[in-house]
Curated annotation (Swiss-Prot):
Protein name, per record: General odorant-binding protein 66
Keyword entries, A-Z: Disulfide bond, Olfaction, Secreted, Sensory transduction, Signal, Transport
Source species of the chain: Anopheles gambiae
One Gene Ontology cellular component annotation held by this UniProt entry: extracellular region
Summary of the function given for this chain in its UniProt record: Present in the aqueous fluid surrounding olfactory sensory dendrites and are thought to aid in the capture and transport of hydrophobic odorants into and through this fluid.
Main subcellular location: secreted
BP GO terms, sorted: sensory perception of smell
Subcellular location: Secreted
């Protein structure tokens, strides 16, 4: 099972929310009703909606995947641990497992392989939109998730997954593909990536689809 953090690098846009499936394990507040119906996915074209630049070095991604992918832990816990591993190897997490905002800002400027437009987009998504989401968490979703993930704190991984959704919503015109499917997903994500409650609704839909 690939992780959200790896999918950012491969631009597998329709699957960037998989790690956020974690929130459906918790009892959240009331979501936006629009988030209960998810657009369809064209598996042949799901990677072509947005050309996302490289966010993390391949050697870091590969090292963390190799370290955790073969473990017998549940897939979601492995996803959480792989993402946290990548962030730690890039020195983006403090000793208390919180994301280091100052280092994130420097990292984006120095390490993200993209245009200034992309760097501005990444900084806004991570620092202004997704980290505040984790800080607010009115339904205490994160604290409820911790018991399901061993010793892996979900907040850093969920921050990255949330940011990935924002990248696709706000993908620069030169890097985006216009198609009915891509436009529908961009509209959906623009409405449903703004609260943990909405993200919860998305993954309840995903789980219902898996059981059919």
């Amino acid at each position: 099972m690939a992780t959200t953090i790896a999918r950012i690098g491969s631009a597998n846009w329709a699957k960037v929310l998989v790690l956020l499936w974690l929130v459906q394990l918790a009892t959240a507040g009331e979501p936006n009703p629009a988030c209960k119906t998810m657009p369809t996915v064209d598996k042949d074209n799901e990677d072509k909606c947005c050309d996302v630049p490289e966010m993390f070095p391949n050697e870091t991604l590969n090292a963390c995947m190799e370290e955790y992918q073969k473990s017998s832990k549940p897939p979601l816990q492995k996803s959480c641990e792989i993402t946290t591993c990548v962030l730690k190897k890039q020195s983006l997490i403090k000793s208390d497992n919180t994301v280091d905002k100052d280092k994130i800002k420097s990292y984006i400027k120095e390490m993200v392989k993209g245009s200034d437009e992309w760097k501005t987009l990444v900084e806004k998504a991570v620092l202004e939109e997704c980290l505040p989401l984790m800080d607010k968490d009115p339904s205490n979703v994160l604290s409820k998730l911790k018991s399901s993930l061993g010793d892996c704190d979900p907040a850093p991984a969920l921050t990255i997954a949330c940011a990935a959704a924002k990248f696709y919503v706000n993908c620069p015109a030169k890097d985006r593909t216009k198609s009915p499917m891509c436009d529908e997903w961009r509209t959906f994500l623009s409405k449903c990536s703004n609260s943990l409650e909405d993200l919860n609704a998305i993954f309840m839909v995903l789980e219902n689809q898996k059981t059919r």
